[in-house]
From Swiss-Prot:
The chain crosses the membrane at residues 3-23. This is Cytochrome b6-f complex subunit 6. GO terms for molecular function: electron transporter, transferring electrons within cytochrome b6/f complex of photosystem II activity. It comes from the Eukaryota. Keywords: Chloroplast, Electron transport, Membrane, Photosynthesis, Plastid, Thylakoid, Transmembrane, Transmembrane helix, Transport.
């Protein structure tokens, strides 16, 4: 059960990182 929670947290972190990178690139293009 704890392994599943850890996997979900890891997935959320990866998704957050990808979203942050995409937002950063969009912001650079906007400027």
């Amino acid at each position: 059960m704890s392994i599943l929670i850890g996997y979900i947290i890891l997935l959320a972190c990866a998704f957050g990182l990808a979203a942050g990178l995409f937002f950063g690139l969009s912001l650079i293009k906007l400027i």
